[in-house]
Amino acid sequence: MCSCRKDDELIMKMTTKEYLENANAEMGRKVWEHYGEEAQTKKFVEELSELITALAREDARAIREEMADVEVMIMQFKQGLNIDTLPIMNYKLNRTMARIENEKSK
């Protein structure tokens, strides 16, 4: 039996953002599996370099484009290496907020 109807119902319940996140994650996983860690590491460095250049030039269009490329690479590495950055991000943001509060009290 075809699960097409069930798939269609699931897609209808998702928001466009959720749908795109799921589709992007699946494509990212396939890219990682095809090219592998070594090739994607080189690609990641290339994309980071392009973002740095765009930032230095203050080119808004290029910054947006290169940020998307870097986010794709981050997604692939998080999936491929099973990395969860959420708790570390929370720690670092809390540390920064504490610094801000400390600076305000001076």
Regions found by a protein language model. Give the residues of each.
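Flexible "arm" and connector segments at domain edges
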Residues: 2-106
